Amino acid sequence: MKISALVMITLLICSMMILCQGQKILSNRCNNSSECIPHCIRIFGTRAAKCINRKCYCYP
């Protein structure tokens, strides 16, 4: 049981590190993720975008 909990915590930490390293934050204000897509395509060349806390986040 302790080993499985340790493995789950390790996977969680690794996945958070991967997402943090890959994301790029834009200063654009947004209300939904579809508003971020044109900006991410123009600046970074990627369509993977999310609007979190009224900021655009672009992912590779």
From Swiss-Prot:
Tissues/organs with expression: Expressed by the venom gland.
Disulphide bridges: C30-C51, C36-C56, C40-C58
Site keyed Basic residue of the functional dyad: positions: K50
Family membership noted in the UniProt record: Belongs to the short scorpion toxin superfamily. Potassium channel inhibitor family.
A Pfam match: Toxin_2
Site keyed Aromatic residue of the functional dyad: positions: Y59
Protein name (record): Potassium channel toxin-like Tx677
GO cellular component, one term: extracellular region
SUPFAM superfamilies: Scorpion toxin-like (SSF57095)
Signal peptide: 1-22
UniProt keyword terms in alphabetical order: Disulfide bond, Ion channel impairing toxin, Neurotoxin, Potassium channel impairing toxin, Secreted, Signal, Toxin, Voltage-gated potassium channel impairing toxin
Record's function text: Weakly inhibits Kv11.1/KCNH2/ERG1, Kv1.2/KCNA2 and Kv1.3/KCNA3 voltage-gated potassium channels.
Gene Ontology MF terms in the entry: ion channel inhibitor activity; potassium channel regulator activity; toxin activity
Top-level division of the source organism's lineage: Eukaryota
Compartments, as annotated in UniProt: Secreted
Entry annotated with the keyword Secreted: yes
